[in-house]
Amino acid sequence: MLQSRFKMPSHDELVKRMDAIPDHVMRECPICHAKFLSMRLGRDHTCPKCGYGFRILAKRRVKITFDKFTEIDQNITVPDRYTDEKYRAKIAKAKKVTGLNESVLTGIGSLNKQQVAVGIMDPFWIMGSLGSATGEKITRLFELATRKDLPVVMFTSSGGARMQEGIHSLMQMAKVSSAVAEHSAAGLLYIVVLCDPTTGGVTASFAMDGDIILAEPHALVGFAGRRVIEQTIMQTPPKDFQSAETVMKHGFIDQIVKRSDMKKTLTQLLRLHTKENAYG
């Protein structure tokens, strides 16, 4: 009788039970492959085992990083001249998912009463790709920061230039870098935080222009994708050759900072590099 009451379910029954579990209940870390309940991600949305920062919406990053934030240029979006139906459908979906009109959220934030110009790229907005409107928003942010003598903190998370916009997308690399150079010439601080993923034209331009370059643990940082590199050099690169940790070993990143420590670290850096502390 006991055997019948505690009989192991069949394979088919187990599959049915697993299928009944909602997808969002369990998560698997793409880095260490640990499996855990979604609630263990916590407020910062990080792996409880290895500290990998899962990709998050730009608006969520604002909430966990800044004391106050006022958005600017929120109505700038993809120009109407791009009429491809598939592209317009992707734009509509991205707007619905993120609540943003473009792949970057810009504004003025504060950390411990220190004002800072903020740019946050959203990986859920067509992979945070760099389009003409993205470049315009970031350029305006740097121009505003230069006029107001503000430091800039930029969180990059992007698949690179947005190919649907062709040369107009690629032009944004030079356009933004020019605005960064003017900001730097004014003696103002620019901090970059490389998030997963930071690749392509963003890596080749303003993501590596910072005075201080931070990164989140295990973030993918590179230019070309692994398959492109393998086909070009006819070799298999190391598994972690584009991880933030490897990139830091080669001198391109100053420090890797856990997401839970990011607010504190940025606050300290801004305080140390204000003109009063640096020159007063």
Curated annotation (Swiss-Prot):
Q: How, per the record, is the cofactor bound? A: Binds 1 zinc ion per subunit.
Q: Which residues bind Zn(2+)?
A: C29, C32, C47, C50
Cofactor(s) for this protein? Answer: Zn(2+)
Catalysed transformations (reactions): N(6)-carboxybiotinyl-L-lysyl-[protein] + acetyl-CoA = N(6)-biotinyl-L-lysyl-[protein] + malonyl-CoA
- Cross-referenced PROSITE patterns: COA_CT_NTER (PS50980)
Under which EC number(s) is this enzyme classified? 2.1.3.15
Localization per record:
Cytoplasm
Q: Name one GO biological process term.
A: fatty acid biosynthetic process
Q: One GO cellular component from the entry?
A: acetyl-CoA carboxylase complex
List the C4-type zinc finger ranges.
Answer: 29-50
Keywords from UniProt, A to Z, are: ATP-binding, Cytoplasm, Fatty acid biosynthesis, Fatty acid metabolism, Lipid biosynthesis, Lipid metabolism, Metal-binding, Nucleotide-binding, Transferase, Zinc, Zinc-finger
Kind of enzyme, top EC level?
transferase
List the InterPro entries: AcCoA_carboxyl_beta, Acetyl_CoA_COase_Trfase_b_su, ClpP/crotonase-like_dom_sf, COA_CT_N
Tell me the ranges covered by the CoA carboxyltransferase N-terminal domain, including all copies. Answer: 25-280
Q: Name one GO molecular function term.
A: acetyl-CoA carboxylase activity
The protein's annotated pathway: Lipid metabolism; malonyl-CoA biosynthesis; malonyl-CoA from acetyl-CoA: step 1/1
Query: How does it associate, per the subunit comment?
Result: Acetyl-CoA carboxylase is a heterohexamer composed of biotin carboxyl carrier protein (AccB), biotin carboxylase (AccC) and two subunits each of ACCase subunit alpha (AccA) and ACCase subunit beta (AccD).
Sum up the protein's function in the record's words.
Component of the acetyl coenzyme A carboxylase (ACC) complex. Biotin carboxylase (BC) catalyzes the carboxylation of biotin on its carrier protein (BCCP) and then the CO(2) group is transferred by the transcarboxylase to acetyl-CoA to form malonyl-CoA.
Q: Tell me its family.
A: Belongs to the AccD/PCCB family.
Return the PANTHER family for the record: ACETYL-COENZYME A CARBOXYLASE CARBOXYL TRANSFERASE SUBUNIT BETA, CHLOROPLASTIC
Protein name (database record): Acetyl-coenzyme A carboxylase carboxyl transferase subunit beta
